[in-house]
Amino acid sequence: MTQLAIGKPAPLGAHYDGQGVNFTLFSAHAERVELCVFDANGQEHRYDLPGHSGDIWHGYLPDARPGLRYGYRVHGPWQPADGHRFNPAKLLIDPCARQIDGEFKDNPLLHAGHNEPDYRDNAAIAPKCVVVVDHYDWEDDAPPRTPWGSTIIYEAHVKGLTYLHPEIPVEIRGTYKALGHPVMINYLKQLGITALELLPVAQFASEPRLQRMGLSNYWGYNPVAMFALHPAYACSPETALDEFRDAIKALHKAGIEVILDIVLNHSAELDLDGPLFSLRGIDNRSYYWIREDGDYHNWTGCGNTLNLSHPAVVDYASACLRYWVETCHVDGFRFDLAAVMGRTPEFRQDAPLFTAIQNCPVLSQVKLIAEPWDIAPGGYQVGNFPPLFAEWNDHFRDAARRFWLHYDLPLGAFAGRFAASSDVFKRNGRLPSAAINLVTAHDGFTLRDCVCFNHKHNEANGEENRDGTNNNYSNNHGKEGLGGSLDLVERRRDSIHALLTTLLLSQGTPMLLAGDEHGHSQHGNNNAYCQDNQLTWLDWSQASSGLTAFTAALIHLRKRIPALVENRWWEEGDGNVRWLNRYAQPLSTDEWQNGPKQLQILLSDRFLIAINATLEVTEIVLPAGEWHAIPPFAGEDNPVITAVWQGPAHGLCVFQR
């Protein structure tokens, strides 16, 4: 039997050098680590890793080749009260594995035990890691590097975006390949999108609870192998990486960036009753935040929390991010529950992972977007991230909905959100683009559902409608559900137009949820994380071409307005913005706080957004000059020159002079 050589302690993971494979694994508390390789017949061969450099275990297997399946058994104490849960009866996934063979099914053998260890061997059913070799021709691929001020983000799910698209070949619908198909790229280009933000593509597992209900984790926020692509989105799992890179290369050629939603805050091992896949059995005490009683700090709502202040876990997270940039040429990341990244355990701007990213010549050059909260005390950190980060701006989301759908927001508060929430983000040298403005996202109502439902309808999720937020700031316009009279449909359409205009013509970086531009509905489900079905798949055959054209016209209009693309904070008298009342006069202090919901916003001295958010038709006197309504509010071939706008109830219009 071949013996392992000592090998090298870096890089982490399994790496083929043409002659054999070097294996490395971090564990600060292990007493012994076995590499387990599986031959073509599934026969297991075990080798002790002979090298031990600091906390890195390593060994080199001569003559090993790509395609080799492997895992680890890690020996050490079973001391739950101290956070140690070693169990060599369980085969473990390499945290840095690039490919996984097998499924993460709900099986009692994939649990380590709660108070007492479960010593039943699980190698026969446990997923295995696969050694891969990386040869890919990027040709002349170059990142688009779209300036932040020109960035328009489109948040989409790999499968849901194309699974029902009639113009994409059936065999590639819902896959990585479909993202790079000319039909999809042409659509994004015509819409005006500059960055495609994908829900998680790193390999994830469905929670046992969902599997028992016949459901699955659709969104992907339950990671199990952070360096491996989720194989279900590939035409062939063996070629998933190349399919993904082909799509990125095609998108880059069209000038479209790719941003990955990445989950560094928790793992699919969940709470102490959850499955054992990897980190818990490799070094539970190091990888997770552990309470004094040995249980997990659950700052994520998912059962565990990764300890991103531990040096080895920081190295792991940094290596993971670099992998996606260097190997897949992604252009940035959106970090799920990103407050966890700054926990020490209190949140700090100089937390170790933030510092590592800032000091990294690779990661400091890509787009970084934080979901700036977690569920622990002190977890709401909007506006408090380091200057390299942009942040999801929930202030904008709530303000836009309250202004147009609940009618309870003063003009001053609305204007503050329209001006990139400078009260929140104008600090530490940050620019307006730090505010990622959104009206909707994957999490919550779609835009159409915001105007059709007053209440969530999440019964299909199997939790008796208890899951999902109740703070939706939505308005069904008088009837719960889709459909209704022509008048009802028109009022809902006007509200959608108002919300889209507010999103796409505000200062900051706009993010559009895929499907909002053509009227996609989830029938009132505001937490569709477990709905891998027609509820979440975009139905292109039912798409509203009129709404799509309206959205595209707004995006193209945005790109013409210097005050929005120059990415500079607006200052009094600089010509970027003037705030006027219905008589084209500057608003008084009282009007800002208590005045009627009527406002004119003059941008770059040439573009005028006239707003009447009252219940009555109102005459709005435009400023001096020759104004004409512009698309999408008037046909280019028939401009209306006017001095007074008859503002319909809950209406708005954009003019140019």
Curated annotation (Swiss-Prot):
Region (Disordered): 458-479
Pathway(s) where this gene product acts: Glycan degradation; glycogen degradation
GO biological process: glycogen catabolic process
Matches recorded under CDD domains: AmyAc_Glg_debranch, E_set_GDE_Isoamylase_N
EC number(s) given by UniProt: 3.2.1.196
InterPro entries: GlgX_C (IPR040784), GlgX_Isoamylase_N_E_set (IPR044505), Glyco_hydro_13_cat_dom (IPR006047), Glyco_hydro_13_N (IPR004193), Glyco_hydro_b (IPR013780), Glycogen_debranch_bac (IPR022844), Glycogen_debranch_GlgX (IPR011837), Glycoside_hydrolase_SF (IPR017853)
Site (Transition state stabilizer): 443
Residues of the active site: 336 (nucleophile), 371 (proton donor)
MF GO annotations: glycogen debranching enzyme activity; hydrolase activity, hydrolyzing O-glycosyl compounds
Reactions it catalyzes: Hydrolysis of (1->6)-alpha-D-glucosidic linkages to branches with degrees of polymerization of three or four glucose residues in limit dextrin
Pfam families reported for this sequence: Alpha-amylase, CBM_48, GlgX_C
Biased composition (Basic and acidic residues): 458-467
Superkingdom, natural source: Bacteria
Swiss-Prot/TrEMBL keywords: Carbohydrate metabolism, Glycogen metabolism, Glycosidase, Hydrolase
Broad class of enzyme this protein falls into: hydrolase
Gene3D superfamilies assigned to the protein according to its UniProt record, in alphabetical order: Glycosidases (3.20.20.80), Golgi alpha-mannosidase II (2.60.40.1180), Immunoglobulins (2.60.40.10)
PANTHER family: GLYCOGEN DEBRANCHING ENZYME (PTHR43002)
Protein's job: Removes maltotriose and maltotetraose chains that are attached by 1,6-alpha-linkage to the limit dextrin main chain, generating a debranched limit dextrin.
Family, similarity comment: Belongs to the glycosyl hydrolase 13 family.
HAMAP family, sorted: GlgX
Protein name, entry field: Glycogen debranching enzyme
Organism, as annotated: Shigella boydii serotype 18 (strain CDC 3083-94 / BS512)
Species lineage: Bacteria, Pseudomonadati, Pseudomonadota, Gammaproteobacteria, Enterobacterales
Gene: glgX
